[in-house]
Each structure stands twice: as C-alpha cells, then as structure tokens.
Amino acid sequence: MRYIPLNNSVYKRNRSNFMNEMKGNSLAVFNSNDIYPVSADSELPFEQHRDIFHLSGIDQEETILLLYPPSKDDRTREILFIRKSDNHTKVWEGEKLSKKQANELSGIDNIYYIEDFKAVLSSIATKVDTFYINKNEHYRANSPVETREDRFISWLLKKYPAHNVAKSNPILQRQRSIKHPHEVDQIKRACEITRKGFNRVLKFIKPNIWEYEIEAEFIHEFINNSSKGFAYSPIIASGHDNNVLHYIKNNKQCKSGELILMDVGAESVSYTHLTLPTKA
C-alpha cells in the first residue's frame, strides 16, 4: 500500500459503534468487492468496498467480516476471513496479508482463511434469529452488475430462509457521517494533495493543450504524494462540454477563450475531498 495505515483503534471503535446498534441475537456479514476482469489475464485495479474498510481497515480482495455481538466467547464476537497466499499467488501477485498483518491492521484477533467461512457461519447461524445484510441503498444506485455482496446475500437467504433480515446500510450511513479524528486527518491530507494538484495544473494550463494532458499533470502530483490516485473518474471539460454532468472522456483540445471545468479529487486511505468553501 502507498499510505500509512490508520491506527486499528479507529476500526475497533467503528465495529463497536455498529454492534451497539444491532438487534439482539443477530449477526452481520460484510464482503469485499470483486476484482473485475477486462481480458483473458488482466483486471481492473482493485477497489475495496468502503463499508468493510470502514469496519476493518483491510484493503484486500476476498475478505469477509463477521460480527456476532451476543457471543459469550470473544473469539466469535468479531471474525475476519482473508485470502490465503499459495505458490501461484506469490509468483503472479505477491504475498497476501498474513493473519498477523491482518490482526495488526484491523485489531481483530480471530482470523481465518476464507475457505473456512461457510463452516464458521453455519456453526453460528443456528444460534441467531436475524442476519444483517449490506445492500447498496444509495438513491442513485442502478448498476446491473451483481457484486460479491449481492451474490452472498442471495446465497444466504436461500440457505437460511427462516431467519429474519435487517439492514446494515442505515446504521452505516449514520455512523460514517461522523468521522474519527484520524479519519479527519486523512480527509485533510486528501485536500492538501488535491490542492497541490490544482496548483500544478494552474501553472500548466495554456491555449491548445489537451484535456488529457491536464489529467496527466494531476495524476503525476497525486501519485508523487503517495495517493492511490484519483478518488473518482476525473472530469476535465473544456468548451461546450462544460455542460455535461459526467464528462470523463477528457480528449478535447482546450482552445483560447474557452473555460475549463475540472472536477478532480485525490484519494488518501480511501478518503477523499469533494467540497470547496464559498470564500477561501
């Protein structure tokens, strides 16, 4: 990773806050995002699901977090499942997190490899009445792509049809809107990296440059400051493309006398900055 991880006390607090709002005799499960293929042997860069990152600090694919607050055994109150490195993985992708590393990042003591998940879930599911599931409930969510979380929820409800279901999303929406001081520090850092990017670009812009050249200046500054890169697809729209809400082609030449609209932000430890003050 390019960033210094947050202290795991942040994630311990986040998990504790979430579990305090869960109904009695229930458990919650959170899944990482998929890695999406683009051809026979190449993939898009991995982006962790923000909710499981908020609760664990684990930035790795094939990760599952299980929370079971009623447990009388601390070993089953918080359980993390991670991908196991094999020889093929070590050669082609590099080492995945060890259990020790996952513990240091998350503050979770009980860690299994992901192939043990269904057996562990089965041993706990018979003891609870309610499953908390984590569906995307954003009012603009309309993607036809079935996520890893979607597949898990379909499997879970078919496997355990007699259990009640509760929603994790309303709890997380409330809790994620209140940031820990360490999280605020990362937002400030994202702001500072973004500021450096804009300062660099303002010195670079001149008539007849191309929008993608401006994009290149931003990404140079972001990565040079240990950011993962753009927090979202950058919008660099000159001329009449100012009027397009989500113009991301960035392939036009910027003519003299035109305005350039830029909607760009850097990411720092999965945090970003999207707002500007009206007076600065």
Where are the predicted features?
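Hydrophobic alpha-helical scaffolding
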Residues: I4, N8, N142, S177, ...
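Anionic group-transfer/hydrolysis microenvironments
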Residues: N33, N136, G239, D263-G265, ...
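Active-site pocket-lining segments that scaffold enzyme catalytic pockets across diverse folds
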Residues: H182-F222, S226, Y232
